[in-house]
Design a protein with these regions (language model features):
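Alpha-helical transmembrane segments in inner-membrane proteins
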Residues: 2-247
Length: 247
């Protein structure tokens, strides 16, 4: 009886300590992320000092304009706020989304090495995007490219196809799902390489995009991707308990 009370008391003490530790870790990582974004903004063909980046943010932040004013050229201000800042934010946002998606895959397949390549999701997205460009469907509508839409369609169709192939009766064995995904991923990768050989000029339009380049990222790209990333993250968070049980 005494041992049970003691263990319960220790658990109550350890829970707040763990929570406090995790909060401190998250705070430290958040500060590190902000610093890395600021540093990355100053790196490029036209280098900008760290202090100048800070001054631009202080001068252009609502509520701080009246408190801070620094004589900064309009060229540096435009370069930071209109070109490099959206790229840095989009890179951080995409990195967070990939981390969340990777965690979900690892929990779903009970494998710490699982990733979007496991069931062909990435190769399906690449095939959808390149097919859109090759067929002349990679247009821009209201300032937003349709390539991400076709990439999403290709990804979703591939996942559903792999799931259907792997289904045995009313069950989907994890091993069969993984093997089917790897096979489909190799097949679609070969098709994308075939596009590169047969249509080199058109493929060049999407080559850097497939490698994850943020060279042409603008604010509209960030705002168009934000709802999908937040929505997907919320859905995954709602199934956190189920993923923990699977893992």
């Amino acid at each position: 009886m005494l041992n049970n009370l003691k263990s319960g008391f220790v658990k109550k003490l350890s829970t707040p300590r763990k929570t406090k530790t995790w909060l401190l870790i998250l705070l430290g990582l958040s500060i590190l992320l902000i610093c890395s974004i600021i540093v990355s903004i100053g790196v490029g063909y036209f280098p900008i000092p760290f202090s100048t980046v800070i001054k631009v943010f202080l001068t252009n932040t609502p509520g701080l304009k009246s408190l801070f004013y620094f004589p900064i050229s309009s060229t540096e201000t435009a370069l930071i706020l209109q070109i490099r800042f959206p790229r840095a934010l989009c890179a951080a946002l995409v990195g967070a989304a990939l981390s969340i998606a990777g965690t979900a895959y690892q929990g779903l397949f009970r494998n710490p090495m699982a990733d979007p390549y496991t069931i062909g999701a990435s190769s399906g997205a690449a095939l959808g995007a390149t097919s859109a460009v090759i067929l002349g469907l990679g247009i821009t509508f209201m300032g937003i490219s349709t390539r991400p839409l076709f990439a999403f369609i290709g990804c979703l169709a591939t996942v559903l196809g792999v799931y259907s192939i792997s289904r045995v009766g009313n069950k989907v064995p994890v091993q069969t799902l993984l093997l089917s995904g790897i096979a489909v991923s190799i097949l679609f990768g070969a098709i994308v390489n075939g596009y590169h050989t047969l249509f080199p000029d058109k493929f060049r339009q999407t080559a850097f995009w497939l490698m994850g380049s943020f060279s042409y990222t603008e604010w509209i790209d960030l705002w168009s991707a934000l709802p999908f990333i937040i929505g997907g993250s919320i859905v995954i968070y709602m199934f956190t308990r189920d993923l923990n049980l699977l893992a």
